Curated annotation (Swiss-Prot):
Heterotrimer of UreA (gamma), UreB (beta) and UreC (alpha) subunits. Three heterotrimers associate to form the active enzyme. Optimum pH is 7.0. It is an enzyme of class 3 (hydrolase). GO terms for biological process: urea catabolic process. InterPro entries: Urease_beta-like (IPR002019), Urease_betasu_sf (IPR036461), Urease_subunit (IPR050069). Induction: By low pH and excess glucose. It catalyses: urea + 2 H2O + H(+) = hydrogencarbonate + 2 NH4(+). It comes from the Bacteria. This is Urease subunit beta. It comes from Streptococcus salivarius (strain 57.I). The gene is ureB. Pathway: Nitrogen metabolism; urea degradation; CO(2) and NH(3) from urea (urease route): step 1/1.
Length: 103
């Protein structure tokens, strides 16, 4: 290996493989932009500004690479893909709507 050299996979990385995604339309009705990160419990995201079917979003997060986010500008409507939280499916913090097991 040469210093600074990268060895990358020849195939695309399936970063959220094995999870079934749902589509959800989201509208920002607020007067400021809202940004939601990759591992935020979408059900609890910005109740004042973002309008969407919250029950469909319960237990789900954005289907985007870790460490990234989606930004919703005021008045903007976007369709996002959501996937289930994995692991033991326990949610703590965020806006304190669950604080325990999802199932």
């Amino acid at each position: 290996m040469i210093p600074g050299e990268y060895h990358v996979a020849s195939e695309p990385i399936d970063y959220n493989g094995g999870y079934e995604a749902i589509s959800l339309e989201v509208k920002n009705v607020g007067d400021r932009a809202a940004q939601v990160g990759s591992h935020y419990h979408f059900y609890e995201a910005n109740e004042a500004g973002l309008q969407f079917d919250r029950e469909k979003a319960r237990g789900k997060r954005l289907d985007i690479p870790a460490g990234t986010a989606i930004r919703f500008e005021p008045g903007e409507t976007k369709t996002v893909q959501l996937i289930d939280f994995g692991g033991k499916r326990r949610i703590f913090g965020f806006n304190n709507k669950v604080n325990g097991f999802l199932d």
